[in-house]
Amino acid sequence: MSSNRTVHSDTSTLKMNSAVQISCLLLVLGCLLGSGHSQSEAEFAAKSREISQIFGNPSVDKYTKARNFPKLIAFYEKYSSRLHLTAQEKNNIDNSIKQYRAQQNHQVDGVSAQGGKLFDVLKKIIKVIVMVVDSTKANEERQKT
């Protein structure tokens, strides 16, 4: 009978070790995901400030804004799910980005087309994204306090 108890005890210990190992693994994964999320928060905040400083500042000239427009697109594509946009705003921005890329790919004498009607559309898009970025930052600041 004592051998039965030993086998049962060894099985219980093995199950307990597995449970402890799984718990430790889950704890480590939770910490990694949590720190990744906080890094993402810090990165989002830094990129938001950068976008606002370039595109939200009326003293920045249109050439600087045009030169940094790829940064704005990259920001939008990476963080669009965090920006509080209506379906219509998102659709308009997506369409404008497609038009912008098509225009950039269309070259005349080896030079991308510039300015024109699309630049006016992009100004509106920039205004919407900057407004949403600013309101998102303000909401996140309020939630911290």
From Swiss-Prot:
Protein known as: Protein Turandot E
Cell location: Secreted
Cellular component annotations (GO), alphabetically ordered: extracellular space
Family to which this protein belongs: Belongs to the Turandot family.
Protein role: A humoral factor that may play a role in stress tolerance.
Organism whose genome encodes this protein: Drosophila erecta (Fruit fly)
GO biological process, one term: response to bacterium
Lineage: Eukaryota, Metazoa, Ecdysozoa, Arthropoda, Hexapoda
Intrachain disulfide bonds: none
Keywords: Immunity, Innate immunity, Secreted, Signal
Leader peptide range in chain numbering: 1-38
Gene behind this protein: TotE
This protein's record includes keyword Cell membrane: no
